[in-house]
Every structure is written in C-alpha cells, then in structure tokens.
Amino acid sequence: MRLAFGGALPIIAATILERAMRFDDYRDKYHTIRLTRDPMGVLEMTIHTRGGPAKWGTSTRSLHAELGHAFLDIARDPENRLVILTGTGDSFIAESDAEERYPEANLSAMWPRIHDEGLALLNNLLAVPVPMIAAVNGPALIHAELAVLCDIVLAVSHAEFADLAHVPGGAVPGDGVHTVWPMLLGPNRGRYFLLTGERIAAEEAKRLGVVGEVLPAAELMPRAHALAAQLAALPTMVLRHTRAVLTRELRRRMFDELANGLAHEGLAMLVPRPLDQR
C-alpha cells in the first residue's frame, strides 16, 4: 500500500480506491473484532477475545494479527463516516491471552510475521480516513496506543493507561509506542512511562492531555455515540480532510520511525527462546 503524506486524503491511495470494500464484505470477517454500523455511517469496533474482555495476543487469530487488516478494510469502505473503538466488559486490554497457540517453534521463527503485522497495525489505524473516537471502557495496560492514537479519547473513571507488554515484559518498545508516548507525554515523561511500567489513572491522563473526557461507565458509550452523531452531521469531505490534517504529523512520524523500532525489537529476539518467555 502506498502512503502519501502531502495530500488531503493521504491513505486513500489508488490501491485502496481500486479495491473499495462494502460493509458486508468484512462485517463478520474477524475473530477478535465485532463490527456494527448505524445508518449515519458510524462504525463501532468492539475488540474482544472469544466473546469476553479483550486479551492481547500474537497468534494468527489474535488482535495483533487482525487489527491491521480490519483498519485497512475500514479505510477502503467509503460508507464509513466515523469510527468508535471500544473494548468488551470492564477492560480495554488489560492482560495477555494465556490460551494462545502458535504455529512457529520460537520467537525468532515468529518474528517475520510479527514484523509485518506490526507495520500494518498502527500505519493502517492512522490510514483510516475518517475521525476515530476511542471509548476506553477500562484498564488499557497493553497496547494502549491503539486508543490514544484516536482523535477523541473518552475514558471511564476506573481506566488506567500503561505499556506493560514491552520493557516490563522484557521486550524492546519498538512497535510504535516509542513514537506515540513521548509525543503525547513529552520526551522525558514518555521515556519514564515506557521504562518503568507506570500506570496513569484516567483523571491524570486527562490532566496530561492524553484523554479528552472522563465519564462514569454508564455514560461512556452514549457520549461516544453523541459525539459521533455530532461529527457525522458534517459533510463527508470536511470529515476526511479534517482527519488528514489532524493526523499528518502522526502519520509522518510513524512511517519514519516504526520500521526502525521494529528492527531493534526484532534484534533483541535473535537469541532463541520458548514462546512462553516473551
């Protein structure tokens, strides 16, 4: 997929326009993402693991494997006018999936797939050409960047934000978090956050500018849909061009830094280790 950073519709490159999707083409395509869309074109993505709260995984049927493809399908569908991203139950992504099974023998063998999925995951999230609202329904302790890269971030009062999948788990934070968090928190606080496994509570995240609103759980989704309806009333081209200008620097930085970060993350995995020693 060709990415261009100067145009108003940066990710609607020729390859995407030529392969436009219809909602029915991908509505039931994914094992870890439930998709619905209302008549206004507001698409709701609910991440889950086997129907329950989402758990992070890297198997071939995991969120890591599917989200990049889902974001690209959404980007290719011209009927999508807003996207709401949320979790299931009372957590966004709070833990890893202990029930995963992998086709590869070790991390070194798995890395080529993880590398490609990692490139697609955040580049394709930022490639969605319409505004995105994150409704963070609980702790976002693993890959919280999925939520905070959205244009509007709403969170319930018991939500927390952390990056426990990388340095605290023995992995290099090279799959985009090294770009996202120093941008949002500032260079020093961002590095502190990544190196220490700090958990930032919802109200503190709002004070830091990471979250736009903190809400009671019962008000989270109604508020997300109210904001989506408000924005969806605008002309389509206003929505798309606004998304383009608001994400331009994020897209540029991610395109420039993600592959390099993944290379460093992969180099740290060259020593063969069992999959349960990630």
Residue spans for each PLM region:
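C-terminal long alpha-helix characteristic of the crotonase
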Residues: 154-159, 211-258
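Catalytic-core regions built around general acid/base machinery
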Residues: 70, 117-129
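Conserved CoA-thioester-binding segment of acyl-CoA-metabolizing enzymes
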Residues: 8-86
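Short, active-site-adjacent cap segments at secondary-structure transitions
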Residues: 90-94, 141-142, 246-249
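Glycine- (often His-adjacent) and acidic-residue-rich active-site loop
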Residues: 51, 59, 79, 86-120, ...
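CoA-thioester-processing core
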Residues: 121, 125, 140-194, 223, ...
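Acidic, divalent-metal-coordinating active-site segment for phosphoryl/phosphodiester hydrolysis
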Residues: 141-143, 197-204
